[in-house]
């Protein structure tokens, strides 16, 4: 069987790898000039660094198993996380449960309440019982008070903006499950994974395995149309860098594009198209600062302060060696935004000027002379907004067009989007496609 895959991110490459190992022909098309999507890298100080911050959790079994299979499992290293929370102009250490008891932004009873509440959520086994509630409503009703208003409410608003009160409670539940599962030791300190050589270690190896198995990966080649005949996918028309349109026939097609991209590539029935269009995506803007010294002592900073105009402050080299990056400290400043938001529209220089005055809130001694270099990245489909009762509305992997499949971050549920889940989904798609062929495509008959 000859299979066309749109997108060379984690899901597309993993599906291609498995399908090739099952004896199929595979061609992958990628609009960007690089592989790995949101896990792709740029050179910083002579070493690859992800365009957006990346790490793994100890329960990210899909990608860890893939690394073992690729022969690079020994490259994964585990580091203790170091977490701060910035609220009302002050930064507090919140790495361990003991730190939470010392969290001076809350009265003692609310600190205890906050910790016990997280344990309560962790013990919920069936996320389906939460589907009818938004995270905002559920947390207000069951946590409430200062513990909600000073911690979770600002974090929800920071991440989802005006959409904070639309997010289904299963999203919050899955976050709690992941964070607890990655804690080790008596002090329950979170351990985070990062591969030696960056995430390139995983995806360059995966890419090389695909090529060695006879697969093809066409970079800088956008698919402009999914061709169909009598309700069945028959091939792809792509556009090369030179503007040439190229048609390639396929027995089936897997698209890993965002829903709003996919819906423009092929005519779809109204009900399925509505499922795609009903999910709103937030974009993201990321600044990476190469600095002569660290801004804080933390790897991860939760920002629960409406006066700070960015959502995340991640100091990569507070967990990983700065020697990898020419001795500089690496700081990510990240934000999720509607694509119509004026901040999303800002240039690199405008965004830097907008953010800089706020860095002294985290370190009064900060001076812009610390900044040696700046990198900018924008993503149009960084975070889907998943609302209540989403299992009733999630788009099927098998589209109404015969032999045409869709797999993207709107279909990772109840978990939030993430590299591990994209790998898992890619493997599931390869299994599904192979099984459907074996069963003579009966799903569509």
Predicted regions and their residues:
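N-terminal Rossmann-like FAD-binding beta1-loop-alpha1 element of flavoenzymes
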Residues: 2-28
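Conserved Rossmann-like nucleotide-cofactor binding loop
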Residues: 11, 34, 260
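Glycine-rich FAD pyrophosphate-binding loop
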Residues: 20-44
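C-terminal lid/capping helical subdomain adjacent to the catalytic/cofactor pocket in oxidative enzymes
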Residues: 387-445
């Amino acid at each position: 069987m000859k299979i066309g895959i749109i997108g060379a991110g984690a899901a597309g490459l993993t599906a291609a790898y498995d399908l090739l190992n099952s004896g199929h022909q595979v061609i992958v098309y990628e609009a960007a000039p690089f592989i790995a999507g949101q896990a792709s890298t740029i050179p910083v100080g002579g070493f690859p660094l992800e365009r957006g911050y990346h790490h793994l959790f100890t329960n990210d079994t899909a990608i860890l198993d893939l690394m073992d299979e690729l022969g690079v499992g020994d490259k994964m290293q585990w580091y203790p996380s170091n977490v701060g929370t910035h609220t009302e102009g002050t930064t507090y250490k919140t790495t361990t449960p003991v730190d939470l008891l010392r969290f001076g932004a809350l009265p003692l009873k609310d600190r205890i309440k906050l910790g016990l509440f997280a344990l309560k959520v962790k013990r919920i086994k069936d996320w389906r019982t939460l589907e009818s509630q938004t995270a905002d409503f559920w947390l207000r009703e069951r946590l409430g008070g200062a513990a909600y208003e000073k911690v979770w409410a600002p974090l929800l608003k920071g991440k989802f903006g005006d959409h904070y009160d639309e997010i289904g409670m299963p999203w919050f539940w899955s976050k709690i499950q992941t964070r607890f599962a990655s804690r080790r030791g008596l002090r329950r300190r979170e351990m985070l994974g990062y591969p030696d050589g960056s995430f390139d270690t995983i995806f360059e190896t995966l890419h090389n395995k695909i090529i060695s198995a006879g697969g093809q990966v066409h970079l800088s080649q956008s698919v402009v149309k999914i061709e169909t005949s009598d309700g069945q996918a028959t091939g792809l028309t792509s556009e090369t860098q030179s503007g040439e349109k190229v048609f390639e026939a396929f027995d089936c097609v897997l698209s890993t594009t965002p829903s709003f991209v996919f819906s423009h590539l092929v005519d779809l029935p109204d009900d399925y198209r509505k499922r795609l269009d009903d999910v709103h995506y937030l974009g993201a803007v990321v600044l990476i600062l190469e600095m002569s010294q660290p801004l804080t002592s933390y790897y991860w900073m939760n920002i629960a302060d409406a006066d700070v105009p960015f959502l995340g402050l991640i100091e990569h080299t507070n967990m990983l060696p700065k020697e990898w990056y020419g001795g500089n400290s690496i700081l990510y400043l990240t934000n999720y935004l509607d694509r119509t938001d004026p901040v999303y529209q800002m240039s690199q220089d405008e965004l830097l000027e907008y953010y800089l005055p706020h860095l002294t809130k985290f370190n009064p001694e900060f001076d812009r002379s610390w900044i040696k270099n700046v990198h900018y990245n924008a993503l149009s489909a960084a975070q889907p907004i998943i609302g209540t009762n989403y299992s009733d509305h999630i788009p099927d992997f098998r589209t109404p067009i015969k032999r045409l499949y869709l797999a993207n971050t709107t279909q990772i549920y109840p978990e939030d989007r993430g590299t591990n889940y994209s790998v898992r989904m890619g493997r599931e798609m390869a299994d599904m496609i192979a099984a459907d062929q074996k069963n003579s495509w009966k799903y569509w008959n």
